[in-house]
Amino acid sequence: MTMPTQESDLVLVNNTESVMEITLNRPDKLNALTSAMYRDLVKLLATAEQSDDIHVVLFRGEGKSFSAGNDLVDFLNAKPGEAGEAAHFIQAIHDFPKVVVAAVQGNAVGVGTTMLLHMDLVVASEDTKLITPFVDLGAVPEAGSAKLLPAWIGYQRAARMLLLGEPMLAAEALEIGLVAKVVKGDELDATARNMAATLAKKPPRALQASKRLMRESINKPLHQVVKEDLALFGEMLQGDEAKAVIAAMVSKSKG
């Protein structure tokens, strides 16, 4: 697999056992995201999507916070066309077909929170705060958060986040299903990496197809979802991947 040429060392990548680990590496600025960083992230996602060797992507942030969101100075100084780099990244992560895990600690501000809505499993440290201060910045919620948050956590909780700008703490985020697991800070990376490694060992086509069904079902009527998942279930069972897994299980049961 040929890795893309990156514009800076503010985004690091490490591939281990079918997992691409992407690290936001700007701890002195709380991993605030610049246009160049967004471009690097889009390139890495494209590489991961095209590679048969990568089954899962893991996002993490170096230092005490996952991400402070957009670098406002960079955003204000962006050249024509660069202001859309964040949107390109959100579109890329939304469309990404493989499973994405996130390890989140400290503050996740703005897009640092809304990007998580397009990832599949979020592991948070106990000190995590999900902060969406869009109105306070004279803006509006982005990355589909105005649709996804009310649908997932209820309008009133979403209004606390998006209108009042109240931080969502890790414990409540776990309780209402915004994150999959909350762990101690010193256990965060190991927990997220173990989760990613576990996912990467699963049959890749089945994993991707299951993610697609879950994501697409959000906007489809139940009867259509049932029809499509039953058809895909039958198709997958006839595939080489499922046959190999089932044959191995039968062989093991026979001793």
List where the protein language model places each region.
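C-terminal alpha-helix plus adjacent terminal tail
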Residues: 1-17, 165-171, 186, 190, ...
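Conserved CoA-thioester-binding segment of acyl-CoA-metabolizing enzymes
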Residues: 1-62, 91
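Terminal peptide-recognition signature
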Residues: 22, 26, 41, 59, ...
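Hydrophobic alpha-helical membrane-association signature
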Residues: 37-40, 85, 115, 188, ...
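Glycine- (often His-adjacent) and acidic-residue-rich active-site loop
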Residues: 42-46, 53, 61-95, 108, ...
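Hydrophobic alpha-helical segments typical of transmembrane helices
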Residues: 85-89, 144-148, 157, 209, ...
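Crotonase-fold acyl-CoA enzyme core
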Residues: 94-204, 239-240, 244
